[in-house]
Amino acid sequence: MKTQHKKQKSKQKTKSNPREEVIQWVKEFVEVPHPMFADYPPCPYAKQARMQGKVDFRELTDMEPDSNIWTSIDHFDFEKKDVLVIIADAKRWTPHYTQKLAAQLNGTYAPRDLLIMEDHPKLIEKVKDVKLNQGRYTLLLVQRRTK
């Protein structure tokens, strides 16, 4: 009986923490110098922004409408913070829809000097052989264009 209980327990999925997984990717890849980028990190500003508390991570739950993305961007204080990272389950949108959504958001927010970049696990972005994607979640990264 005890053996069966242990087997059942090991089969249970541990609840993932999307925010922590994305932060781990930022720390272990985005902020780390890489020879492909002349020994600079893929994003040379990421570590400083994160360490100074200038990055916010917002998880979009399965129950929320897409319109909450606009609400999150509208209420984000880009004077105090540099980047808003919106995290969604990879199955929420197709790669094509993710690109269309980012284009629509860019059309809406370009007059406010904002840039929205999308990252979907199935939209592989590479520089030579270096994959830049987070790989597990769909991300919308929102920041000022001119900063």
Identify what each model region corresponds to.
Residues 2, 11-147:
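Expand to "…catalyze enediolate/carbanion chemistry for C-C bond making/breaking, isomerization
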